[in-house]
Amino acid sequence: MAKLTKRMRVIREKVDGTKLYEINDAVALLKELATAKFVESVDVAVNLGIDPRKSDQNVRGATVLPHGTGRDVRVAVFTQGANAEAAKAAGAELVGMDDLAEKIKAGEMNFDVVIASPDAMRVVGMLGQILGPRGLMPNPKTGTVTPNVAEAVKNAKAGQVRYRNDKNGIIHTTIGKVDFTPVQLKENLEALISALKKAKPAVAKGVYVKKVSISTTMGAGVAVDQASLETAN
């Protein structure tokens, strides 16, 4: 506990919770404070001006970050025929239909993303209680239910992030690793914010992107001055 206490004391001394940091300063601060013995992820929380209680104001989707996430993503694909061969060629680790469903029912969950062609949803639908709670259920809004499974596999491998607001209207996702360059993290964040703005519900009123904070896995949040991002306008 002593190490954690010391770490948190340093964070409190370094991070001004009332300040908006220019993006490069924010990234530099995260890198300075990232002292864990592993390469920490850089996470982002975006507070949106939506009413999450209303279904027509919920924001959900996916976007490919220009510099990826720094993670090796394992992909499972439910499809058959020519699509199965295309999915394998695109790099999917697991491809199948009922046989893949049986593996998952037996507890084989060695994957990070599940993709399905529309004709496979009859099989995937029976796995809702297993995949749903883990956030793995394929959905057309995130591009994981698609006739072009090969492209979806390539996107997942290239660093696609899926996003969905929580009950407080906040989007939580990752934009890379702490060993990314400042430019890579900035451009990944800008790509995410741009995607969120394109996904703005038509009925949302007032300021849409209210607050943007970045943090490392073990660190505190640092509020980013949106004027320092290319998506400011």
UniProtKB/Swiss-Prot annotation:
It comes from Shewanella oneidensis (strain ATCC 700550 / JCM 31522 / CIP 106686 / LMG 19005 / NCIMB 14063 / MR-1). GO terms for molecular function: rRNA binding; structural constituent of ribosome; tRNA binding. The keyword ATP-binding does not apply. SUPFAM superfamilies: Ribosomal protein L1. Part of the 50S ribosomal subunit. Belongs to the universal ribosomal protein uL1 family. Binds directly to 23S rRNA. The L1 stalk is quite mobile in the ribosome, and is involved in E site tRNA release. It comes from the Bacteria. The keyword ATP-binding does not apply. Keywords: Repressor, Ribonucleoprotein, Ribosomal protein, RNA-binding, rRNA-binding, Translation regulation, tRNA-binding. GO terms for cellular component: cytosolic large ribosomal subunit. InterPro entries: Ribosom_uL1_bac-type, Ribosomal_uL1, Ribosomal_uL1-like, Ribosomal_uL1/biogenesis, Ribosomal_uL1_3-a/b-sand, Ribosomal_uL1_CS. GO terms for biological process: regulation of translation; translation. This is Large ribosomal subunit protein uL1. It holds the Pfam family Ribosomal_L1.
